[in-house]
Amino acid sequence: MKISVNAVDQMHQLGAKIGAQLKPSDVVVLTGDLGSGKTVLTQGIASSLGLSDITSPTFVISRIHKGTPNFIHIDAYRLLDSSLSNFTDLDFESYLPNSIFVIEWGAPFVATLTDQYLDIKITQGENENSRSLEVTAVGQRWQGFNL
């Protein structure tokens, strides 16, 4: 499904709609250029779970926000040029049953966690604040997913 947003607050609201449909063991993969809105979308997702103060974990790779469920925000950008074992060594799969994951730059790594995930690609739109999102539901868990 393709979605267009024209402002930062629309991206945040879209994230909240996505987040309202998530449950433990769900994984959302975000791909897009730097500054495309991945973190804003993540902030919206987290807001639907009652979380605030979400920042990009670029330099620390991941942030675990404890709760029921846990919310794990991963920025895998720094791992893109490394081996897959560097991602698996971080042992995220042990958190999967009780956590919701959002993984920026996660396409090369998602298969180590699950074969069912929501894949969102974000591209620049026609103006500075507009973005186009291509949302692909992968696996049976996501059948019937709609926004």
Can you describe what each PLM-predicted range is?
Residues D33:
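P-loop (Walker A) phosphate-binding loop of NTP-binding proteins
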Residues L51-K66:
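Short beta-strand-centered segment that lines the nucleotide-binding/catalytic pocket of NTP-utilizing
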Residues M1-K17:
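N-terminal pre-Walker A segment at the start of P-loop NTPase domains
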Residues K38:
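Conserved lysine of the Walker
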Residues M1, S82-S85, D91-L147:
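Short phosphate-coordinating micro-motif centered on Lys-Gly-acidic
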Residues G19-S25:
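Phosphate-binding P-loop
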Residues V28-L30:
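Hydrophobic anchor at the beta1->P-loop junction of P-loop NTPases
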